Design a protein with these regions (language model features):
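PP2C/PPM-type serine/threonine phosphatase catalytic domain
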Residues: 2-267
């Protein structure tokens, strides 16, 4: 399978919201093994969300779509206070969880999905990202030379890492690495984690399904994200690297370049 077969992608999109200038691109590829793509992405000025469905056949695809459809209702023309947006997201996730559980009862399949990403909000009048996560999809940030995973995986191996029983390197090859502990649907707890982080003068943000970080190390991801190429090429390189490493799962990436109005975006 080439990088173009079955691939969905956006062109570079530009937007300004709440004093932050943004450009972004999203790519979703089924990978080299899976016949269907159960990932989904939702993007707009100040809203960058991803869902990785599970359940086989069309159940996972329906689950991820249901989550993103519910979360789309949170979008507004200007950023709202972080606490208000958080409460809205919790309500929408609850609605999505109920809808996905109904998929189980109608089809007999245990549908579920992860959700991760960022929404631009304000905190004490200053632009902040509200980061949300449930499951093992990830949100990263590269700013001022510092690369960090903003989210924490809800997975068995992450719990073992936290308990000191596995190293991150061991977790990458552990047979339990794909077992998640939270999701929307799938008979799991739908409790999301949230973080409120200040928007930086210039930052690159990456939202991805585990089809990316399951194939590439954080160092490999950082090297590509830190390269001096347009963000569409950066996204292409991330997906291509995951496919070249095996492409055993669907691979979806959202790459965002964000700059506050106090600095020159130099686009």
């Amino acid at each position: 399978m080439t990088a173009d077969e079955g691939e969905a992608r956006s062109e570079i999109v530009y937007g300004v919201q709440g004093g932050v200038s943004m450009k972004w691109v999203a790519i979703s590829n089924p990978g080299r093994v899976r016949l269907t793509n159960e990932d989904g992405a939702l993007t707009g000025p100040g809203m960058f969300l991803l869902a990785d469905g599970m359940g086989g056949h069309d159940a996972g695809e329906v689950a991820s779509a249901a989550a993103l459809e519910a979360l789309a209702e949170v979008f507004g023309p200007e950023p709202a206070e972080a606490q208000v947006v958080m409460e809205q997201v919790v309500d929408r996730l609850r609605d999505a969880h109920a809808a996905i559980e109904a998929i189980d009862s109608e089809t007999g399949k245990r549908a579920g999905t992860t959700v991760t990403g960022l929404l631009l909000t304000t905190y004490e009048g200053v632009p902040h990202w509200l980061v949300v996560n449930i499951g093992d999809s990830r949100t990263y940030r590269l700013a001022e030379g510092y690369f960090e995973q903003l989210t924490v995986d809800h997975s068995q191996v992450q719990e073992l890492i936290n308990g000191g029983f596995l190293s991150p390197e061991q977790a990458r090859v552990d047979p339990r690495r794909n077992v998640i502990t939270r999701a929307l649907g799938a008979g799991m707890e739908p409790d999301a984690d949230f973080w409120i982080v200040p928007a930086q003068p210039h930052e690159k943000l990456l939202v991805c399904s585990d089809g990316l970080n399951g194939e590439l190390t954080d160092d490999e991801i950082r090297q590509i994200l830190d390269s001096d190429v347009p963000i569409d090429e950066c996204a292409d390189q991330l997906v291509a690297a995951a496919l070249n490493a095996g492409g055993r799962d669907n691979v979806t990436v959202i790459v965002v370049d964000a700059t506050t109005e106090q600095t020159d975006p130099d686009w």
